[in-house]
Design a protein with these regions (language model features):
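N-terminal "arm"/small-domain region of PLP-dependent enzymes with the aminotransferase-like
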Residues: 1-61, 139
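Active-site pre-lysine segment of PLP-dependent enzymes
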Residues: 109, 126-138, 151-172, 176-206
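Short acidic capping loops at alpha-helix termini that bridge into adjacent secondary structure
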Residues: 65-69, 90-93, 139, 176, ...
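PLP-dependent aminotransferase-like
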Residues: 52, 88-145
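PLP-dependent aminotransferase class I/II
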Residues: 196-274, 280-281
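PLP-dependent enzyme catalytic core of the Aspartate aminotransferase-like
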Residues: 159, 302-306, 315-343
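Conserved PLP-binding catalytic core of the aspartate aminotransferase-like
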Residues: 261-262, 274-306
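Phosphate-binding glycine-rich loop
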Residues: 55-93, 111
């Protein structure tokens, strides 16, 4: 039994996966009388349960073998499957670095997994001295790292990330949802080096397909075989697979749009610091900015009252709003309305 198998829950190791009709017969042509589908209608056939065409396109884009690619119904499904595969309910633990993406903790609660919280340091980076004692905990199975981090926007020090991967006995899940805006190297280049690393990316951010719900996980085949084993058989609809494929057929608009958003993020940061109600704007590697303002609740209410919706993060980070970089026109309207607020 290899290291990955030892980390997996015994019932998951022993699970005989559901075999769908399209697992047993993969060809596209024929008279299909095997899946109890209607013979009528434009969307009458079940989708490809393994998303072969889409995974092949992603393989070409990322330069990775198809067997190292898993697709989820959004990254939230990948997060949930991590808990289901590796954590025994009521026994095992996961670790997060708050303030960070909230679904790590929500999924843990749904799966009855205890969460250890190691707050980020004063620079919103990983506190290595604080986390190191937990790395030998035999009950700790998962560590979630978000880089660039939501809601702070910064990338974690890659050396600190790698220190955790090398020294942790369990699985490290690195969430790179915003990596396309950072200009940094992705850790997908390292999945061949580390058998305990899962890297998540998404179609929701730079690719502009949040409505389609397509999340990506990159890891060793030894890990991903369990994801394919326990996932629902048809977790990505035909419509969403086709939409993602269409988006990948011409990548130039995505690159242009990403560059535009990075430029707007920088411009927005420069303009925000001149507004009286703004106290601080943190550097960002994402498509948003963390902004400290005077009386965040009041500023939030005034902006939403003018149909400008930002995210109030003052409960997690005192006095802070998270502001997404929009179009130039949207950003100018935000700046104009924010400049009118007197507190």
């Amino acid at each position: 039994m290899n290291r990955t198998d030892q980390l997996v829950r015994p019932n998951v190791r022993a699970l005989v996966p559901y075999s769908s009709a399209r697992d047993e017969y993969e060809a596209k042509d024929g008279i299909f009388l095997d899946a109890n589908e209607s013979p009528f209608g434009p969307l009458n056939r079940y989708p490809d349960p393994h998303q072969r065409e889409l995974r092949a396109a992603i393989s070409t884009l990322k330069g990775l073998p198809e067997e190292t690619i898993f697709l989820g119904n959004g990254s939230d499904e990948v997060i949930d499957l991590c808990y289901r595969i590796f954590c025994n309910p009521g026994t095992d633990r996961a670790l997060i670095f708050p303030p960070t993406y909230g679904m790590y903790q929500v999924s843990a609660a749904l799966n009855d997994v205890e969460v250890i919280k190691v707050p980020l340091d004063e620079n919103f980076d990983i506190d290595i001295p604080a986390v190191t004692p937990f790395l030998e905990d035999e009950r700790l199975k998962l560590i979630f790292i978000c880089s660039p981090n939501n809601p702070t926007g910064n990338s974690m020090d890659p050396g600190r990330i790698e220190f955790i991967i090398r020294n942790f006995r369990g699985v490290v899940v690195l969430d790179e949802a915003y990596a396309d805006f950072s200009g940094r190297h992705s850790f997908i280049e390292k999945i061949g080096l580390y058998d305990n690393l899962i890297v998540m990316q998404t179609f929701s951010k730079a690719m502009g397909m949040a409505a389609a719900r397509v999340g990506m996980a990159f890891a060793s085949p030894d890990i991903l075989k369990y994801f394919f084993r326990i996932k629902p058989p048809y977790n990505i609809s035909t419509l969403n697979q086709e939409a993602a494929l269409q988006r990948l057929r011409d990548f130039r608009p995505i690159t242009v749009q990403t560059d535009t958003l990075i430029a707007e993020r920088r411009r927005l940061a420069e303009k925000l610091v001149a507004i009286p109600v703004v106290e601080k704007v943190w550097p960002s590697d994402a498509n948003f900015l963390l902004v400290k303002v005077r009386d965040a609740d009041t500023v939030y209410d005034k902006l939403t009252g003018r149909n400008i919706i930002v995210r109030n993060r003052s409960r997690e980070i005192a006095g802070c709003l998270r502001i997404t970089a929009g179009t130039r026109g949207e950003n100018d309207r935000l700046l104009d309305e924010l400049g009118k607020i007197n507190i």
